[in-house]
């Protein structure tokens, strides 16, 4: 991944591990053609609108995935939000409010699932003890490879 140019038209980035190309358009509506991998983005305030859209999409996708994984794990959480965090992919507060960086959307879905399971494991274990990692491993047996992907590629995910 490369840093985006000032003019975003034609810029490509990964969205859940799939190529997404920006096409600047006149008008006011953002639309995404998932089949073709094209994000139609209004020219006016394009960068700001893109980040807002990414946060909204991240909250929706990550809320759905967190619900699904929480049911699978038999655990509960208070809420889900998407932030602009650049130093943490996710966090779980003492009252089980979960926050994710919207930049997780740039990672493959399997990596996102690891972060979701990691944060949900914190609803039971508020540390990174052996019990915590056993909980993660129960639901994501290859968590080490997924965590390594984040460590190896995290810097590439700071495009917006």
Predicted feature locations:
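Walker B catalytic acidic pair
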Residues: 119
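Walker B beta-strand of ABC/ABC-like P-loop ATPase nucleotide-binding domains
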Residues: 116
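Active-site-proximal or metal-binding-adjacent scaffold patches in catalytic folds
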Residues: 1-113, 123-160
